[in-house]
Amino acid sequence: IHGQTIGFRSFLKTTTYSKLTFEYHHMEEFRRGGDLLNRPPHEANVAEQTEHSINGGGLKYDYFSPNEKHSFNVFASAQHINRDSYYGGGQDLNAYGNTTDLNWMAGSQYVYSFGKCIFMPSDLTAGIEFNQDKLEDNMWGYHRTVDQKVNIGSAFLQNEWKNDHWGFLLGGRLDKHNLIDHIIFSPRANLRFNPTQNINLRLSYSSGFRAPQAFDEDLHVENVGGNVAMVELAKDLKEERSQSLSASADIYHRFGAFQINFLVEGFYTKLSDVFALTDGEVKDGILTRTRYNA
């Protein structure tokens, strides 16, 4: 394995209450596994080799009001990946491949600080975001191509009431995924209680989802075992959902110059409509497996 990385991050103070931040990075990485490492991968008995070229960058504008009640930002970022790969065994000349992935996102977020909202001070946060990912994975020797384009539009809203002893957070997120025919709502809630400065008790609930996708890195791993595989999505495939509940108690105590911290934490997560793969069937020399909800 060897690699090199170069990049920069900088900002420009546009006014007393605003700034513009920009960054860029470039990375090259080579990895090789298997045997006969001093020979080309197709001359080895088993080989995994990847060579990445990654370019990415972002731009962000932040504004803060003079009275510190309003803050606003707008951002955009993008990353392009080009990867040449070999996953195969038995001196297989067909196991070379190439993967390209272009991902970009843009969005905005607004925060308003209430001196008092109903019963205590709070911060209201609202935002929107759009994310697009276009991936193409080719293994020409096996006539296998995966072309996947994903668009996700999101909006979120939350309000957090807080003082020295209590904190209440209620919020939710709406997501529209182009591979799912309905809007997904993901709520979240958090309760914090500090009976003293050294004791922090917290109870949280959150939910999320995992969208269907045809591409899976495990496809390349199967090639090493001699199997050429593709994944199809079942027609009635739904998103995978998660519901999580967590609780924690965080206690601090100081003994002279020393401070100890005691933390107890527990969580419970429930998954529904979990993704699974069929054993599949061979079509034209390619193992085709179907992703479905278990």
Which positions does each model-derived feature cover?
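Flexible loop and strand-edge segments within Gram-negative outer membrane beta-barrel domains
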Residues: G3-T5, K13-F72, A78-N103
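Extracellular loop and loop/strand-boundary signature of outer-membrane beta-barrel proteins
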Residues: R39-E48, K60, Y87-N98, D137-D147, ...
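Residue-level signature of outer-membrane beta-barrel architecture
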Residues: L12-T14, D62-S65, T100-L102, Y110-K116, ...
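Membrane-embedded beta-barrel scaffold of Gram-negative outer-membrane proteins
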Residues: S71-S85, N194, R202, D236-N293
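Short loop/turn motifs that connect adjacent beta-strands in outer-membrane beta-barrel proteins
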Residues: T16-K19, S65-S71, S113-D123, D164-H165, ...
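Transmembrane beta-strands of outer-membrane beta-barrel proteins
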Residues: L20-F22, H70-A76, A106, S122-I128, ...
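Transmembrane beta-strands of outer-membrane beta-barrel pores
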Residues: H26-F30, Y63-S65, A78-N82, Y112, ...
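Surface-exposed extracellular loop regions of Gram-negative outer-membrane beta-barrel proteins
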Residues: I1, M27, R32-G33, S71-G88, ...
